[in-house]
Regions:
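Short connector loops at secondary-structure junctions
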Residues: 43, 51-54
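Short, charged beta->alpha transition segments
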Residues: 12, 32-39
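Single conserved hydrophobic/aromatic residue that forms the stacking wall/gate
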Residues: 1-13
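Short, conserved, surface-exposed binding loops centered on an aromatic residue
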Residues: 37-42, 80
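C-terminal capping/extension of enzyme domains
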Residues: 15-17, 21-30, 53-84, 94-147
Length: 147
């Protein structure tokens, strides 16, 4: 049943998800979950996606430039062109490059550093992307996300 969870992922990815939960807690006062299960987000329309969908164990970026970018760029472009009032959260310098694929007149684009343990203290913590996303959605008459 669980579609998206951190179980089975390496420690680096668990720490990134923990940093995301920590920011949600700081931003919205939500309790930090005890599980990495993201099904509740998906059921509300959240689509968590990395630019590169696989990696060799313990080798960050090892599958970059192996073709994933073509696919994920097409997904981003299709969503941008085919929908309105989406929120794109682009975290990290590599993700920020994807802004060229997004119609910023139709969508909200939020950028900051990556939530990795190495960079989260340099702008991810305190970015308030989750409350900003909800404010934008509500301003468009769309139900906010229960993060």
């Amino acid at each position: 049943r669980d579609r998206l969870r951190s179980r089975g992922l390496g420690d680096v990815y668990k720490r990134q998800l923990a940093n995301i939960f920590k920011e949600i807690h700081q931003d919205l006062g939500k309790p930090i979950p005890t599980s990495g299960n993201l099904d509740r987000w998906v059921e509300q329309g959240v689509f968590p996606m990395n630019s590169v969908l696989t990696v060799r164990a313990h080798e960050t970026g090892s599958h970059r430039n192996m073709g994933w970018e073509t696919f994920t760029d097409a997904v981003i472009k299709k969503l941008s062109d085919g929908r309105e009032n989406l929120v794109f959260m682009l975290w990290g310098s590599y993700a920020k490059e994807k802004i060229a694929l997004i119609d910023t007149h139709k969508h909200l684009v939020l950028t900051t550093v990556h939530p990795s343990p190495r960079s989260a203290d340099h702008g991810f913590f305190g970015c308030k992307h989750f409350s900003k996303a909800n404010t934008f959605l509500q301003s468009k008459g769309i139900q906010k996300i229960d993060w």
